[in-house]
Design a protein with these regions (language model features):
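Extra-cytoplasmic beta-strand recognition segments
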Residues: 40, 84-111, 140-144, 169-170, ...
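Glycoside hydrolase catalytic-domain groove-lining segments
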Residues: 209-210, 344, 350, 363-439, ...
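Extracellular carbohydrate recognition and processing domains
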Residues: 121-150, 160
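Beta-strand acidic-aromatic groove motif in beta-rich domains, primarily in extracellular
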Residues: 48-52, 85-87, 109-120, 151-155
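Active-site cleft segment of glycoside hydrolase catalytic domains centered on the general acid/base Glu
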Residues: 235-238, 265-378, 391-400, 406, ...
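Extracellular glycan-recognition surfaces and repeat-rich motifs
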Residues: 33, 39-82, 208
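Aromatic-rich peripheral "rim/lid" segments of glycoside hydrolase catalytic domains that contact
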Residues: 194-197, 402, 421-455, 459-467, ...
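Extracellular carbohydrate recognition
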Residues: 84-85, 158-174
Length: 519
């Protein structure tokens, strides 16, 4: 990557403003061994306490109404003044073990808190926040390990006047969920440190940024590799050196091959200068040799790559013009050369194909349908998803789910990010620097950045059949350091990304790193 209704009804009961939601009674008259009325269809619209459910707090703010996800009705939370309400159901007589709650939700955003949790299950309460999605329904999951034969399903809102949520089609079944990749791209790190970049933990103590990220929960690092860039960075040499640091922290490694001397993305896929003028047949050999050389060197030093991207954001192909999607048979040959080189070094290394189409269902289908038809070999699907460019969270979930199901492959977010503030640290304009460019419901604050990452991770976690692997944050360490700009041919260029790093303008680790601890 680089740069470039809710219907209103009269309240049924007076609101008891300000009641806390933490003193839920230990049990209720609604105890059952299976979830009752998870689709809110039993009572119809206008019911203050749907069958099977109980309420606590400002109870008039919780009610059923028309406009369900799968049926005719849904549960809604809304009030014309600030409110706190919990809609819950107590389950007893459960067989101990792993369970998963699935729910379809919508939210207008703006609440102090809006989440679904599983609690009183014998262990730590598990929560999933409701992503902001004012129109499309989003599926979320909440996993729990029941150890005391009971569990409480809890739908919570701590909201300001006019805030709303919709919830529908809840199921509570055996199973579990979670993601295995809590990662970040740190390709900028080597040059940053060479140019004087400093990184601190949240207390302000200078330290190794790889260790700081690891301590926050990061478990996978992504490094890009260029062939012969003008500034000498992001080469095999830097990848080998940084890989040692990554593996020393017990993290896994993804190597992202651009097959270029410069950034590759949907708008540019230039061949390396050393490969200029090569025939298509020679380019296939170039791809194989370059891929094998870098990966074999990593293996030789004990830092074998765990995953490899053959190409970066290859919407239009790679190694233009020979590898353009205008000539799919040639693109397939190049991609398969990369795949074969990866497997020749280590058969266990997973090979990913990466598109910048995280919210583009039709585009993702078209591309991968062509890849499959041409016999392209791959193990994993990676998608870039930046909410300010690539569509809504609903679009994102629809695309991700479809890719996993249609091709039977695991999926992951290869790149995403979000600003923690507006306004550049240096004199260079940032990529996202206006409030009008933000995703609705997600402010440019540390809290907004944290919420964005957790909500993206929740959507990946909810991919059916456990095919959602996780998320990579893009360029967590790209702070504003003179000389470490986006253009390797221009030392005066800024990076335009420092307001989306995971280290602040004071070089301290941001609280938003907490997203690495997402399930």
């Amino acid at each position: 990557m680089f740069h470039p209704r809710r219907t209103i009804k009269a309240l049924l009961l007076p609101l008891a403003a300000g009641l806390a939601l933490t003193s839920l009674p230990a049990q209720t008259a609604q105890a059952a061994s299976t979830l009752t009325n998870g689709g809110f269809e039993t009572d119809g619209a206008g019911t203050g306490t749907p069958s099977g459910w109980s309420e606590y707090g400002d109870t008039g703010a919780s009610f059923s109404e028309s406009g369900g996800h799968g049926g005719s009705y849904r549960l809604s939370h809304w009030a014309s003044s600030a409110y706190k309400v919990e809609t819950y159901q107590y389950l007893s007589g459960l067989t101990n073990g792993n369970y998963k709650l699935t729910a379809w939700v919508r939210s207008g955003g703006g609440q102090n808190a809006a989440y679904i949790s599983l609690k009183n299950c014998g262990g730590t309460e598990q929560r999933t926040n409701l992503p902001v999605s004012a129109s499309g329904w989003i599926r979320i999951v909440v996993p729990v390990n029941v150890t005391n034969n009971q569990c409480t399903i809890s739908i919570n809102s701590d909201a300001n006047a006019g805030n709303w949520i919709n919830v529908d089609d809840l199921t509570f079944t055996s199973g579990t969920s979670g993601t295995s990749i809590h990662g970040a791209d740190i390709s900028s790190l080597a040059k940053s440190e060479a140019k004087g970049g400093v990184y601190r933990n949240s207390s302000g103590t200078t330290g190794d940024p790889v260790a700081v990220l690891k301590s926050a929960g990061m478990n996978y690092a992504r490094l890009k590799v260029w062939v012969n860039p003008a500034d000498g960075y992001n080469t095999k040499t830097q990848v080998l050196a940084t890989a040692k640091r990554i593996k020393a922290q017990g993290m896994k490694l993804l190597v992202d091959f651009h097959y270029s001397d410069f950034w590759t993305d949907p708008g540019q896929q230039a061949k390396p200068s050393a490969w200029s003028g090569h025939s298509y047949s020679q380019l296939k050999t170039d791809v194989y040799n370059h891929t094998y050389d870098v990966l074999n060197a990593l293996k030789a030093q004990g830092t074998t790559a765990d995953m490899v991207q053959v190409g970066n954001e290859i919407n239009g192909g790679m190694l233009w013009n020979e590898g353009s999607t205008a000539n799919w048979s040639q693109l397939a040959g190049l991609l398969n050369s990369g795949y074969d080189a990866v497997k020749a070094v280590n058969s266990s290394t997973q090979v990913a194909l990466h598109l910048a189409k995280g919210g583009d269902l039709a585009g993702t289908r078209s591309w991968f349908d062509s890849a499959v038809a041409q016999g392209v070999k791959f193990d994993v699907i990676g998608l870039s998803y930046y909410g300010y460019w690539h569509g809504s969270l609903y679009d994102f979930q629809t695309t991700l789910d479809d890719a996993a199901a249609r091709y039977g492959k695991p999926v992951y977010v290869a790149e995403t990010a979000y600003p923690f503030r507006l306004g550049s640290e240096d004199s260079h304009e940032d990529v996202i620097d206006l409030s009008s460019e933000l995703v609705s419901g997600y402010p440019a604050t540390v809290a907004g950045q944290t919420r964005w990452m957790n909500d993206v991770a929740s959507i990946v976690e909810a991919v059916p059949n456990g095919r959602g692997l996780g998320v990579f944050y893009w360029e967590a360490t790209w702070t504003a350091v003179t000389g470490n700009g986006w253009d390797p041919t221009d030392a005066s260029s800024g990076n335009a990304w420092e307001n989306q790093a995971l280290f602040g303008y004071d070089d301290r680790a941001l609280a938003s790193m907490s997203w690495f601890s997402h399930r």
